[in-house]
Swiss-Prot record:
Belongs to the chorismate synthase family. This is Chorismate synthase 2. One of its GO terms (molecular function) is chorismate synthase activity. The gene is aroC2. GO terms for biological process: amino acid biosynthetic process; aromatic amino acid family biosynthetic process; chorismate biosynthetic process. The keyword Manganese does not apply. NADP(+) binds at residues 39, 45. Reduced FMN (FMNH(2)). FMN binds at residues 132-134, 253-254, 298, 313-317, 339. It catalyses: 5-O-(1-carboxyvinyl)-3-phosphoshikimate = chorismate + phosphate. It comes from the Bacteria.
């Protein structure tokens, strides 16, 4: 499976085309809209989320609530486009139009794609860069993730995400929660945190950053249960599932780090405390005593829960802008200010769920049959029986 997205932040719409989704998957706009709504929530979101409704329109690949096996096209309209019709229109603008009408930007913002993108593509108007590099694009990545989650659900895999840290405020580790319990708790938390004792402290940190014109980042974790043993491959570097998951996390706007299982903590522990001992019994088959590997060894699943974390840096659009240089005059200026969030970590957690879900669903479809859901389900059932008796 693969997908491609298109659209600008203040353009008429965002589009995603999904290829390789099996036939026979139950899919409705309601499934996708539920995930889009989750992305819009979270303490610290900016005014843009008060403008956009973010509802999907399925325009191909689905008939009467069932996927056809052909490419699926999803679009999400940008409600804010009505205020940007002239600025973001596709037709040429006359020479008489002023810079103000075009809303031309010549001052790149530190921490963004602005300067590097302008140099790469030769744009003298940095708006041409920021409109596409904006995290607004993750709207349709969440839509794609919603389709992947539906695949996982029908294949017996559950997934959930939560926030571990915001602005230096750390949540306590809470173990032995089911995926359903994690989902319930986080959906009722304004910061998607499992630890209620630090919830208010996280919100205070966000509010303090906002009042001072600053921004803060954090850490999110995604957990998936129900993956069969042996999904992925050790044979080639580009087939290793952990590599794909790390790449997916790092592809999210403003994410600067990824780890699986105990991650970087493994560097501080001896091997005897890191590696997960193998157990077997007639009821479960092969299991592990611990899950320090985060459900992945040698680029393949172990049958234990997949545990992936991502680090999001503070959003670089600040209301007390950093120093920059005008690309036209080369004079020092304060960077341009675009409407932004003070903290998007809770929403980014939803995006992280989506990209992890896509990679897991892709791996299952690739390994167990690409054409139709019924065949994939049969093959996974047969594989699980084989793995248990191996």
């Amino acid at each position: 499976m693969r997908y491609i997205t298109a659209g600008e932040s203040h353009g008429p719409q965002l589009t995603v085309i999904l290829e390789g989704v099996p036939a026979g998957l139950t899919l409705t706009a309601e499934h996708i809209n539920k995930e889009l709504l989750r992305r819009q929530k979270g303490h610290g979101r900016g005014r843009r989320m008060q403008i956009e409704t973010d509802t999907v329109e399925i325009v191909s690949g689905v008939r009467h609530g069932m996927t056809l096996g052909s490419p699926i096209t999803l679009i999400v309209k940008n409600d804010d486009f009505k205020h940007w019709t002239k600025v973001m229109g596709a037709e040429p603008i006359s020479e008489k139009e002023s810079k103000e009408m075009k809303r031309t930007i010549t001052k790149p913002r530190p921490g963004h794609a602005d300067l590097n993108g302008a140099i790469k593509y030769g744009h003298r108007d940095i708006r041409n860069v920021l409109e596409r590099s904006s995290a607004r694009e993750t709207t349709v990545r969440v839509a794609a993730g919603a389709v992947a989650k539906q695949i996982l659900k029908e294949l017996g895999v559950e997934i959930a995400g939560h926030v571990l840290e915001i602005g230096g405020v750390e949540a306590k580790h809470i173990s032995n929660l089911s995926i359903e319990e994690i989902q319930t708790i986080t959906e009722n938390s304004p910061v998607r945190c499992l630890d209620k004792t630090v919830e208010q402290e996280m919100m205070d940190a966000i509010d303090n950053a906002k009042s001072s014109g600053d921004s803060i980042g954090g850490i999110v974790e995604v957990i998936a249960e129900g993956m069969p043993i042996g999904v992925g491959s050790y044979v080639h570097y580009d087939r290793k599932l952990d590599a794909k998951l790390a790449g997916a996390i790092m592809s999210i706007n403003a994410f600067k780090g990824a780890e699986i299982g105990v991650g970087f903590e493994a560097a501080r522990q001896p091997g005897s405390k890191v590696h997960d001992e193998i157990l077997w019994d007639e009821e479960q088959g092969y299991t592990r005593k611990t899950n320090n590997a985060g459900g992945l060894e040698g680029g393949m699943t172990t049958g234990m829960p997949i545990v992936v974390r991502g680090v999001m840096k503070p959003i670089p659009t600040l209301y007390k802008p950093l120093a920059s240089v005008d690309i036209d005059t080369k004079e020092a200026f304060q960077a341009s200010i675009e409407r932004s969030d003070s903290c998007a970590v809770p929403a980014a957690g939803v995006v992280a769920e989506s990209v992890v879900a896509w990679e897991l669903a892709h791996a299952l479809v690739e390994q167990f049959g690409k054409d139709r859901m019924e065949l994939i389900q049969q093959n996974i059932t047969q594989h699980n029986k084989y793995a248990k008796e191996f």
